[in-house]
Amino acid sequence: MVYFAGTILFCIFAATLNKRYSMIIGRKEEIAELEKLYHSDRPEFVAIYGRRRVGKTFLIKQALKGRITFQHTGVSPVDQDNEKSRMKTQLESFYYALLNQGLEGYKAPKTWMEAFFLLEQLLQNLDNGERQVVFIDELPWMDTPRSGFLPAFENFWNGWCSGRDNIMLIVCGSATSWILSNLSKNKGGLYGRLTAEIKLSPFTLKECAMYFEHANIQMSQYDILQSYMVFGGIPYYISYFQKGLSFEQNTDKILFGNKPRLKDEFNRLFAAIFNNPEDSKKVVRLLATRHSGFTREEISKATGLPLGGGLSKTLAALVESDFITCYSPYGMPKSTICYKLIDNFCLFWLKYVEENSKDAGFISDNMTSDILKAWHGVAFEEVCWQHIQQIKRALEIGGVKSSLSAWNVRGDENQDGTQIDLLIIRNDNVVNLCEMKFASSPYTISKEEEIRLRHRIEALKATLSPKQTIHLTMITTYGVAYGKHSGIVQKEVTMDSLFE
């Protein structure tokens, strides 16, 4: 009888969880981690970070719906030009949140030390012995210059929260570099205090397909792939898609015309995340001009930003925020580092939106034209890089240790240049030379294309040891068309595999 009652309780609990999470697409690991932390018997200090618009706030509010004791969101610095008034604005907003959630009998705080003392009083008054979740969203925005915010926040955790077993403090931020430097890698009062870090990544192609299905928006894999090439799997962006409209129509409404949904998103994005938005935009604008990227020295020369601490911090912040990545090009000394743009949305914005934002039908009018052809190729390559695990599974090498690289050899008067955008260098002595081709039908390899591919294979072979074998691997939307020149291909990965 006890077992039967327990079974009923478990079924009710499971049904409640399923209902609570029914609105969340993917994020299974993150939800499981939050549940584990919520049910622990110790104080928890959790930092959740990731690119702006990636769904951090939505995840917390849905996963812990009905279980948050206090929540507050920092005020965006966008449109706040007066540095002196920013601290006052943040403190006022925090005080009003305290009042709205039950604080009584206290005047507005003048310092952050006072503000967190008021939060302690509120939590003590609401304490019934159960878990108390304190959720502070966009925490980095609250740390305005010379405000004394960080020492007060340190004191709040070290002096009060850490001694209460039922406290779960969750902080979020789009300014990933702030979260990492001030919380994760803090060398002061918050050193080693985080009990958990959760990095929220953009949706995969599979998760985007799940979202569109959940929203009852009918889209083919081909169009979902194109939407990913534009919006990069950012949930907030694709939430603007409307059913009954094509990919082209939706993209035009979201990005182009007189009243696009994401008007001035590029500038607002950088202003909300970075302390030095103009320097960050300079770097991103430069990286958008060359797919293979630039070295630190090239970036400094082209942007006018001096080599040293300032540029290093800007590059580090962009890398940590997943706008750019750095890699050591194949065949170059390991000390040679290239930085390349990997944010799909920024790439598309700089390539097309800035110059054509008023053209309400830009995508619909140019989808099959040469204007978008070059972008299709570059953007598809980025999507492939973002789905390396799916590609490795399709190649049945998921368990084989490997490294990734790209190879770019500039030609001269004596020899042609060679560019390989993805190499999978495996520990089993096989190198997958990956060619990524976006096409609306099976890709046909011509005689000229076969000659070019053989040249690349021979050029790469000259740099490898005799033990290593090269597998030409075609990654395409609909596969390679069978023909007299397709025999050169060793392995294939199609669009279907990217959705796995």
What label would you give each PLM region?
Residues 1-370, 472:
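Phosphate-binding site recognition
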Residues 329-500:
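A cross-kingdom feature that marks ATP-driven nucleic-acid transaction machinery
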